[in-house]
Amino acid sequence: MASWLYECLCEAELAQYYSHFTALGLQKIDELAKITMKDYSKLGVHDMNDRKRLFQLIKIIKIMQEEDKAVSIPERHLQTSSLRIKSQELRSGPRRQLNFDSPADNKDRNASNDGFEMCSLSDFSANEQKSTYLKVLEHMLPDDSQYHTKTGILNATAGDSYVQTEISTSLFSPNYLSAILGDCDIPIIQRISHVSGYNYGIPHSCIRQNTSEKQNPWTEMEKIRVCVRKRPLGMREVRRGEINIITVEDKETLLVHEKKEAVDLTQYILQHVFYFDEVFGEACTNQDVYMKTTHPLIQHIFNGGNATCFAYGQTGAGKTYTMIGTHENPGLYALAAKDIFRQLEVSQPRKHLFVWISFYEIYCGQLYDLLNRRKRLFAREDSKHMVQIVGLQELQVDSVELLLEVILKGSKERSTGATGVNADSSRSHAVIQIQIKDSAKRTFGRISFIDLAGSERAADARDSDRQTKMEGAEINQSLLALKECIRALDQEHTHTPFRQSKLTQVLKDSFIGNAKTCMIANISPSHVATEHTLNTLRYADRVKELKKGIKCCTSVTSRNRTSGNSSPKRIQSSPGALSEDKCSPKKVKLGFQQSLTVAAPGSTRGKVHPLTSHPPNIPFTSAPKVSGKRGGSRGSPSQEWVIHASPVKGTVRSGHVAKKKPEESAPLCSEKNRMGNKTVLGWESRASGPGEGLVRGKLSTKCKKVQTVQPVQKQLVSRVELSFGNAHHRAEYSQDSQRGTPARPASEAWTNIPPHQKEREEHLRFYHQQFQQPPLLQQKLKYQPLKRSLRQYRPPEGQLTNETPPLFHSYSENHDGAQVEELDDSDFSEDSFSHISSQRATKQRNTLENSEDSFFLHQTWGQGPEKQVAERQQSLFSSPRTGDKKDLTKSWVDSRDPINHRRAALDHSCSPSKGPVDWSRENSTSSGPSPRDSLAEKPYCSQVDFIYRQERGGGSSFDLRKDASQSEVSGENEGNLPSPEEDGFTISLSHVAVPGSPDQRDTVTTPLREVSADGPIQVTSTVKNGHAVPGEDPRGQLGTHAEYASGLMSPLTMSLLENPDNEGSPPSEQLVQDGATHSLVAESTGGPVVSHTVPSGDQEAALPVSSATRHLWLSSSPPDNKPGGDLPALSPSPIRQHPADKLPSREADLGEACQSRETVLFSHEHMGSEQYDADAEETGLDGSWGFPGKPFTTIHMGVPHSGPTLTPRTGSSDVADQLWAQERKHPTRLGWQEFGLSTDPIKLPCNSENVTWLKPRPISRCLARPSSPLVPSCSPKTAGTLRQPTLEQAQQVVIRAHQEQLDEMAELGFKEETLMSQLASNDFEDFVTQLDEIMVLKSKCIQSLRSQLQLYLTCHGPTAAPEGTVPS
């Protein structure tokens, strides 16, 4: 038995005194009971800690001896007066037993004086006295988790269970509980088993079988697994005297010893018992944790599933250590990576699979790419309702080392901050996604590791500044949403509230379908963190709501009885409540800067159009939403309005609905439909693929899914205006009906509905929309759709007949639906609408504009010229889709401008042409993925750029308007136009005045219709007053006037070229040349179609702008774009036509395809000091062109349309770059040589006989420099004369220069992004100043590139070019 004595001393950490014990003749454990305090010195035990250990050991042995006597003499009355035992403690509970005897000895006897016994629980239950002693022992020596103590729970039904307990030195650790309880010799312990529903109401989950009974991986039986990991006390905590209060009893049971004080000041220990799927003590390594938690997930993803593993817990509890680990003890990331690569190498069928990694964080509800300089990301939903992180950079890794290096790089970018508990606490949720893809980049499986931000009570925050509070609030809100999602999934609720936070939205794919989730709750053992630890354990327990610990002792009747009661807490956290209230802080945070002039949220609640306002066959769709730009605040509140995304998925920004004049509202409907149509087109095109033609018939089905509701607020408007505007719009709308059934004029619906009824319906629809959209997205937008405004100016004759071709309708509807769907699916998060993001978008819009072209154009390269034209036209339509955003932007711009109606009217003023439009062409044309679609697929930066371009240029609005007008026009045209060959032009020159003066923004839109060669051209000019004056010009000339109230720009009068042979004239290449700013006129035949759509009738007419045109445009960018420039420059450009046969062969083909439709594109440069999207949008809005019969590609002044229409702006270099990139990508585009552009003055090859030049009118001083003459030159023969080899070399030089410029612009873009991200904390004036500096740098960068472009044009342009060179 000496060996048993030695073991006992070892356990008590007294092994060094074993020789002293044997020297005194102590050979057996029971002999230790004879030792007294006087013998300690004889045994050589002088250290006080050792003496305490020895004393406790002797005390335990004496108790056990008395226990043995009690077993042998049951009738003996036990004397317990020396022990403070409450009667309540006699209840059954865990029994900790020390056993130092061999199992064989235990078989021979139930009790032994030699050591502690190991016996069955039935023996305990048979003897209450014995259990009393054990209870006392338990009170004295709570076990510590690090020693893996096992506890048997004594209950009536568990009598047969057999418990074996190991004990370790911690039981004898000095002052284990005395440190907690002070002088209390035997603390009173109350045991509380935290079973399901212990604190949060009764759970609905079913009893789960004990995990110890499971032999298979947990992923085969459960969707969610909750584990707990306890970290050891740190050295610093030990020095501070903190006590370990956590005990890991077994692999599923955890005890927390909480110090409590009764009312009578009696101190006691409250023992909390928790049950989890797996409990890891502090001795467990990351490898142990990995094998039990993540390893089964790796197997799962190789079976084609999704998996998520996330660490949760208080800051400083070991989450990051668990996930990332150290070099010596790698975390779950590294272990999973090793496992993945090992499986890829071993399994032959998996040789073709590759590993991709992405790393981003969610900080304060925003997404940032940690592998791409913290670039802002956006979470969107695709058509399959799968969440896509737009712009997320994914890196392919081929080794564990590279993967860890990538993770290390991203970890350095994480947002951290000092908290009350941890000096370097993670203040963001870090998401590492490891994806397994095949060679075609199809995702085979994906696992996400999430290192959640540290949860912490607001009261514990070290800093009380606003940012810290917002961080904490965001973290806690997202964690609450995460818990609710997991519980809803585990209990199979019908609705899972994924949209309550950005975290759950991003993790949606990890929780649905064939997805497995593992939660690792990390806890600290220190008594200082008791409350945090309990909160973490309760959170984890609530997530799983396990009942396995009580499956034997909880009666069925009691469970059923209590299950009916839901705690108020459960009800409070219901998804409905959270969506409205919990997210409100975020909503306020994001939206407070966007509209300073917006009325109180209550007053701005948007009204929705009555359902009756929509034609019967048109699906309700909503216009895309664009985040309000800063500039928007300038507009009067009355013009603010919100475009609601479709109720299905979109979001409505409550309080953003600005009041609308009824006249606008009518157009709104039709506009919405049109926009929706465009959108759908884009969608379908994406689905069908870049090369496939887009068939409107298919699209129509898509539209039907979408419901459009556009809120309109009442505004006092004369009934005359109302009826005037609405009639046209309604008529147009009815055109859009999908099935081509006779469309009844929408005007009837409007006029028949009492205003109060409309308001009620609008209010209800808007109200219900809010519940279907994340509140974060409900921000105020301060813009109104220009299309709607323009529509009211539409000549009555524009109304469509019932014959509207179904294809067109389906197209528009599809467009609409697609856009809406896409917007909704993408679920524009507040990110996308946030003020900052919009600014960023603005910054990048120029680039986007170029990219927009690329979106459409690059898809059509392989096709024949005719098809290209059609597709380009389609692209134009698609661009409206992309333009949807733009439209919003443009609309927004208009709304900002009190006079926006004028502009809107201009945009809308597309008088119907008299020729049937070639719908089939429209149907066949496919732009490939629409820019919007591309948006979803493209990296964030390009997407933002795209959006930016759209918004800024207003081009988007313009596009939308064009689309709307096109659809209207096309519908009308189809009904009314006798021949497709008639050329109808509508040119709206929109002048953008200084942002401050709405009057200056007035735009004049002149729909020019050439019904026949001799047919009078109707000109609708919109004047500042906002009234459209239809006029006929027998000569066929179109007069455009723009009046500026401020007088900044002198009236610009353009006489449109007369084309006596309207029908015969092929699309002409028209280039608008501005001294300083060259407005591009899209060449109907030559170049790729501008991203802007041409009115549907004019789709044929939509002029693909040749790359040359784009180049010209670039070269013609304003000589000095100064951010402070007051006005966007609008320069009249001569427009020339030449017969298709005289165009370069390619152009001729295009021209043929265009059916000799002429498209004039004016890109108005928006050079205003404000580079915001708002300005751009305004300008873009102004620049919209409507073409009555033949949809015109329209260009917004502020925004260059696709490449050609891009207007140089301070930020336009991006656009130019993109254009160049497009050129590079698509050599097939018309070359400069094809365009035959003169070096500086832009020369379009034209037949002089057929071309009538527009006479340049005085250009605003801002635009034209005195030194830059506008010398349009027409070289009929030089269309394609450049020398190819030399041209290619020169192109390479320009391309290199462009690449450098791209890099510089990217740098400036990043600076601008950073500036915008800091907008909340910066003074706005300072922000504007810094933004102005960035714009100046961008302008210089652009000018540098332009100098190269001018050099190129000088060297390789037509021989006559030099004399017309415009200084750059």
Curated annotation (Swiss-Prot):
Any one cellular-component term (Gene Ontology): protein-containing complex
Keyword Nucleotide-binding present in the record's keywords: the answer is yes
Q: What is this protein called?
A: Kinesin-like protein KIF24
List the SUPFAM superfamilies.
P-loop containing nucleoside triphosphate hydrolases (SSF52540), SAM/Pointed domain (SSF47769)
Q: Which residues carry this modification: Phosphothreonine?
A: 621
Query: InterPro entries, alphabetically?
Result: Kinesin-like_fam, Kinesin_motor_CS, Kinesin_motor_dom, Kinesin_motor_dom_sf, P-loop_NTPase, SAM, SAM/pointed_sf
**GO molecular function per UniProt:** ATP binding; identical protein binding; microtubule binding; microtubule motor activity
Pfam families, per the entry: Kinesin, SAM_1
Q: Does the keyword Plastid apply?
A: no
Which residues get modified to Phosphoserine?
102, 112, 478, 584, 622, 646, 826, 829, 1012
Lineage, broadest ranks = Eukaryota, Metazoa, Chordata, Craniata, Vertebrata
Compositionally biased, Acidic residues: which spans? 819-830
Q: Where in the cell is it found?
A: Cytoplasm, Cytoskeleton, Microtubule organizing center, Centrosome, Centriole; Cytoplasm, Cytoskeleton, Microtubule organizing center, Centrosome
Spell out the Polar residues composition-biased ranges. Answer: 557-576, 839-849, 871-881, 1106-1119
Show the segment(s) annotated as Interaction with MPHOSPH9: 478-709
Q: Provide ranges: composition bias, Basic and acidic residues.
A: 882-906, 1138-1148
**How is the subunit organization of this protein annotated in UniProt?**
Interacts with CCP110, CEP97, TALPID3. Interacts with MPHOSPH9.
Q: Which UniProt keywords apply?
A: ATP-binding, Cilium biogenesis/degradation, Cytoplasm, Cytoskeleton, Microtubule, Motor protein, Nucleotide-binding, Phosphoprotein
